[in-house]
């Protein structure tokens, strides 16, 4: 059944998985394997998770984490303001966090609402950032240096390194954490593939961010 209220008009059926990134702490059994893989580290931003997709007929659909939303919803209006709907082609989906005033206490103190794209899909297959449509990388979550944030040492070492991360979105403001997106063409063990699913990513949350914001 559809939840009452809001602008939900149907179930989530975009050509992608629902956004999800397990915490690294739940993947300790795969840490040695993860350290052999190439991954793009990106800043995790705290907003409202939204998916925009184009079906085979060229119709654009917008979704919250679990539901399709009305085409007049504020999520769609913001996506259109940034012309994300014009960047898609049939069978494609873009996933982004909507951030700014009035959303999640606007902890990054952004001056206006905006999207931060974190994943793009074509026919249920997540694609690397260098394959994204023109214009979309300009609206992406910040990418961090792959060498500086290479997966090394122990899980605890990595968690400690992320603790206190700040200033990658808004000067001097604590960042929520880091999400590592595995490059698409790598072979994963069956166990790790099952843990990550088609999203093929995982996160470390910044403990200082949680503490400061009472989360």
Could you say what each language-model-derived stretch is?
Residues 1-215:
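Core nucleotide-handling region used for phosphoryl-transfer chemistry
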């Amino acid at each position: 059944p559809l939840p009452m209220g809001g602008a939900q008009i149907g179930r989530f059926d975009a050509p992608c998985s629902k956004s999800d990134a397990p915490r690294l702490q739940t993947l300790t059994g795969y840490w040695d394997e993860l350290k052999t893989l190439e991954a793009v580290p990106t800043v995790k931003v705290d907003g409202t998770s939204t998916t925009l997709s184009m079906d085979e007929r060229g119709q654009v659909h917008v979704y919250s984490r679990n539901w399709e939303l009305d085409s007049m919803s504020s999520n769609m209006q913001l996506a259109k303001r940034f012309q994300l709907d014009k960047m898609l082609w049939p069978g494609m989906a873009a996933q982004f966090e909507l951030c700014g005033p009035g959303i999640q206490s606007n902890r990054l103190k952004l001056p206006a609402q905006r999207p931060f794209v974190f994943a793009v899909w074509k026919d249920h297959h997540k694609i690397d950032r260098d394959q994204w449509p023109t214009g979309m990388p300009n609206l992406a979550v910040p990418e961090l240096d792959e060498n500086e944030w290479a997966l090394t040492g122990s899980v605890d070492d990595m968690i400690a390194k992320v603790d206190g991360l700040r200033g990658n979105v808004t000067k001097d403001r604590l960042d929520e954490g880091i999400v590592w997106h595995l490059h698409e063409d790598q072979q994963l063990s069956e166990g790790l593939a099952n843990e990550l699913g088609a999203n093929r990513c995982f996160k470390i949350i910044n403990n200082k961010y949680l503490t400061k914001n009472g989360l």
